[in-house]
């Protein structure tokens, strides 16, 4: 499956139980969050329980398709659980990028390369990574051509772009709502279809079937009710590839 939707809240609970069973849970405990808030301990509040389903789906996909030595990049890596869990699974070439300057306080900074910067304009060489992840990133200030162009440039041919986004089949109006200083989008079915077609222009194609069906609004945030969609694309060579192979930006 290349596109899946979190159908029920219980599926998210089951995913967290599986993450914990496998020893891959890095969500910061509440008492540690208190220490961070009072600045007794410096650190990042990692992970969200609400993101259990898409994090697990991403980990499973990478385990099945990517070797442990493949270079992997996480977009929007600040507070993301993905790289921590991949490190625990034995993946050895991990990089995270985010605009947040406190990114370097993330766990395993001795083993994971953290880069402060804009993931839509990076200095990574062409075709550096075998997989790129983006958990709940695209809905914030989304600009399809800019993001897909850069992802395609950084990905090796045959590499994967895996992530999730806020979703509901019918349009959820978020006009005038900003999150992290950026416009926020809850993608509709039509918008998600358009996103997939935009990605194709940059050689990023679905790896399997697409399922847009949703049955339960599993998330309530900022007075909006919706769920999550998870996706997996693979980079292929396409005629008239718009990526400039001589440019790193």
Which sequence ranges carry the predicted segments?
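Conserved alpha-helix/loop element of class I SAM-dependent methyltransferases that forms part
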Residues: 50-69
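Class I SAM-dependent methyltransferase SAM/SAH-binding core
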Residues: 73, 77-121
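A conserved beta-strand element that flanks and buttresses the S-adenosyl-L-methionine
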Residues: 133
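Short catalytic micro-motifs in class I SAM-dependent methyltransferases
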Residues: 136-140
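A short glycine-rich, Lys/Arg-flanked "PGG" loop and its adjoining helix->strand segment in the class I
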Residues: 145-160
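Conserved class I S-adenosyl-L-methionine
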Residues: 162-189
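Short alpha-helix
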Residues: 184-209
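Core SAM-dependent methyltransferase catalytic element
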Residues: 210-249
């Amino acid at each position: 499956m290349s596109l899946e939707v979190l159908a029920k809240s219980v599926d998210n609970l089951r995913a967290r139980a599986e993450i914990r069973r496998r020893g891959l849970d890095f969500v910061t405990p509440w008492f540690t969050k208190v220490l961070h808030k009072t600045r007794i301990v410096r650190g990042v509040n990692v992970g969200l329980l609400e993101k259990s389903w898409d994090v697990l789906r991403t980990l499973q996909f990478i385990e099945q398709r990517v070797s442990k030595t493949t270079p992997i990049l996480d977009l929007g890596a600040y507070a993301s659980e993905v790289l921590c869990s991949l490190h625990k699974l034995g993946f050895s070439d991990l990089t995270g990028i985010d605009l947040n300057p406190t990114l370097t306080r993330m766990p395993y900074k001795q083993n994971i390369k953290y880069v402060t910067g804009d993931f839509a304009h990076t200095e990574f060489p062409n075709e550096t990574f075998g997989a790129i992840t983006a958990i709940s990133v695209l809905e914030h200030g989304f600009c399809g051509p800019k993001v897909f162009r850069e992802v395609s440039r950084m990905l090796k041919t045959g590499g994967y772009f895996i992530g999730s986004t806020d979703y509901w089949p019918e349009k959820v109006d978020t006009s005038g709502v900003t999150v992290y200083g950026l416009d926020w989008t809850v993608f509709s079915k039509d918008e998600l279809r358009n996103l997939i077609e935009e990605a194709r222009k940059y050689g990023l194609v679905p790896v399997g079937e697409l399922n847009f069906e949703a049955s339960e609004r599993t998330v309530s945030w900022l007075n909006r009710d919706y769920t999550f969609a998870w996706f997996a694309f693979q980079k292929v060579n396409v005629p008239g590839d718009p990526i400039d192979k001589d440019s790193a930006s």
